[in-house]
């Protein structure tokens, strides 16, 4: 995505210098403000509920909030979400939080990379799950 962003920016007269860094230092660079644009990826949505992701990456003061995004209204909605258990009400809160993220341009979503899992006929039950963890499960076994 970085190279594509660089190429697109060049088309409109913006020079982009790319700096590849180890994933372990990205959040630190972001927290220190040592960037103009950080491209990082997060693939895991552990349970199909975005609360963990939204709070961790977008709530004010959270360690993983490397962007420095801060919006008191988002934080208040996040606090409400943390104590709300009714699925319909949680959905409403999440939608409102997502609208704030979009309106504030807090995050740019480039897409979702295609992932492939390849095995030969000696392996059975190898399948990709809807999150990036647990690809190797108790169900994967020798086909023999």
Question: Where are each of the predicted segments found?
Answer:
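Periplasmic binding protein-like
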Residues: 7-58, 94
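Short, solvent-exposed loop/beta-turn-alpha elements that line the ligand-binding surface or hinge
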Residues: 29-34, 55-83, 112-144
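Bilobed periplasmic-binding protein-like "clamshell/Venus-flytrap" ligand-binding domains
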Residues: 34, 38-41, 85-121
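Bilobed "Venus flytrap"/periplasmic-binding protein-like clamshell domains
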Residues: 1-6
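Conserved C-terminal helix/tail region of periplasmic/extracytoplasmic solute-binding proteins
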Residues: 10, 16-17, 82-83, 88-95, ...
